A protein has these predicted regions:
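Short glycine-aspartate micro-motif
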Residues: 44-46, 56, 99-103
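N-terminal beta-alpha supersecondary unit
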Residues: 1-51, 80, 84
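Nucleotide and nucleotide-moiety/phosphate-recognizing core
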Residues: 38-41, 63-80, 87
């Protein structure tokens, strides 16, 4: 849905939900046909219950429950972030427990310890904005495309200097919590101070922002 949301510099929930409606069933059908599979092989259907955008979640849950009802199989409700946490276990060389995972998205930024038996400990989290949101908002300020992460990274590689030296909130704190709202505001002020936003400015701001965000 990148092309759909690019005009707005971020996800528009209503548009995302409508696009889910038009694409999800054909996508599922195509995947089964492409891999020569039958729906009868399914023993259950797992679906995300959230957290996330209400509209797209509703579409996914409606379709999952409809298919499950037709096949007379159970639906397994999955926590969105827990699913991300456990994805490494599907790798050919999965990590041994306990392991620590960094979850970064447009809505969440968490450092989580994963133990046996579905036990999780949040070691740190953002106290305000998610890192993905900060990247998207910065990209929008610089009139770049969506999603912001790849666009900023591409420009950052062209700069050799930390020209703007943006703040690193909480970097010296004793905890593992994070903060990105101040960084986002610092980028806004830097852009406002410039008479005009040149290509060189975009490159240097992207580099300075990315350096501060990942430090």
């Amino acid at each position: 849905q990148i092309d759909l949301h690019n005009l707005y510099g971020g996800v528009v929930p209503e548009l995302a939900a409508r696009d889910h409606i038009s694409r999800l069933v054909p996508l599922i059908k195509n995947e089964f046909e492409k891999n020569d599979l039958s729906f009868e092989i399914l023993d259950a259907i797992a679906v995300s219950k959230g957290p996330g955008l209400r509209g797209p979640l509703l579409v996914g849950n409606t379709i999952a429950n409809s298919i499950a009802y037709a096949l007379k199989i159970p639906v397994i409700n999955v926590h969105h972030m827990e699913a991300h946490l456990l994805m490494p276990l599907l790798d050919a060389n999965p990590p041994s427990m306990p392991f620590v995972s960094l979850l970064v998205s447009g809505g969440h930024t968490l450092i989580v310890k994963v133990d046996e038996g579905g036990r999780y400990t949040i070691m740190g989290e953002t106290k305000d904005d998610a890192l993905g949101e900060a990247f998207d908002k910065t990209a929008k300020l610089l009139n770049l495309g969506y999603p912001g992460g790849p666009e900023i990274e591409k420009l950052a590689k062209l700069s050799q200097i930390d020209r703007f030296r943006f703040p690193r909130p909480m970097i010296n704190s004793d905890c593992l919590n994070l903060s990105f709202s101040g960084l986002k505001t610092a980028v806004l002020y830097a852009v406002q101070k410039l008479d005009a936003l040149s290509d060189e400015d975009k490159i240097d701001i992207s580099n300075s922002f990315q350096n501060a965000a990942v430090d």
